[in-house]
């Protein structure tokens, strides 16, 4: 069972709960998906059962078509946020990590075409592999100007920087809190840069953010 932990692997005293995500938050990714830039952030939720440890081998579905990787900056919430100001958001951020928003792309395409919600494509079991978190007070970089990259079998597929986000981290979380109360232990995913693509059994992935790297593989 997944538990929040720091980058070194020590358990953190936060409950595991929901993941609130934003789609279409990088212009180049929007272009590669053939989508239009939304007027407001596109939000969706992954349940607790979507979370798994990025350090462990990834179990992906085999019965629903292609499974795509999307590397994202993850934000750990450390206090309740409801109708929050940006000042409250800054104080409530407990840490930063990196996550994969695994996506059943064929399923998502059908649901988009039918005008239906994305949950089946985005919120399935183990769809959110998550790293350990670096405490906000110890994060030496700028979370809003942090590099993100993902390589598969030594080939770089995704490379971006959080500086390119359309909706920046703090105002984005404040916006989320207008609709969903965020509690300590909740995680926010902030969108993916371009270069998303399919995963296959046996693939080895290296995920990097702000100079920190993790390697995992697909079962």
Curated annotation (Swiss-Prot):
Its cofactor is a divalent metal cation. InterPro entries: Fumarylacetoacetase-like_C, Fumarylacetoacetase_C_sf. It is an enzyme of class 5 (isomerase). GO terms for molecular function: acetylpyruvate hydrolase activity; metal ion binding; oxaloacetate tautomerase activity. Its EC number is 5.3.2.2. Mg(2+) binds at residues 70, 72, 101. The keyword Methyltransferase does not apply. It catalyses: oxaloacetate = enol-oxaloacetate. The keyword Isomerase applies. It holds the Pfam family FAA_hydrolase. Keywords: Isomerase, Metal-binding. This is Oxaloacetate tautomerase YcgM.
């Amino acid at each position: 069972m997944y538990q929040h932990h720091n980058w070194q692997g020590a358990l953190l005293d936060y409950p595991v709960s929901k993941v609130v995500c934003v789609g279409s938050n990088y212009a180049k990714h929007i272009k590669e998906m053939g989508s239009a830039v939304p007027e407001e952030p596109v939000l969706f939720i992954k349940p607790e059962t979507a979370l798994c440890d990025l350090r462990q081998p990834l179990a992906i579905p085999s019965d629903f078509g292609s499974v795509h990787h999307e590397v994202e900056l993850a934000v750990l919430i450390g206090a309740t946020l409801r109708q929050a100001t940006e000042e409250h958001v800054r104080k409530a951020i407990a840490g930063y990590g990196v996550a994969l928003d695994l996506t059943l792309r064929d399923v998502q395409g059908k649901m988009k075409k039918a005008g239906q919600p994305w949950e089946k494509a985005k919120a399935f079991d183990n769809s959110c592999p998550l790293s350990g978190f670096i405490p906000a007070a110890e994060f030496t970089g700028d979370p809003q100007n942090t590099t993100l990259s993902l390589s598969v079998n030594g080939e770089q597929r995704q490379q971006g920087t959080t500086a390119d986000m359309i909706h920046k981290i703090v105002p984005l979380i404040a916006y989320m809190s207008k609709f969903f109360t965020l509690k300590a232990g909740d995680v926010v995913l902030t969108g993916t840069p371009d270069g998303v693509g399919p995963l296959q059994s046996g693939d080895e992935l290296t995920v990097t953010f702000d100079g920190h790297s993790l390697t995992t593989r697909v079962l």
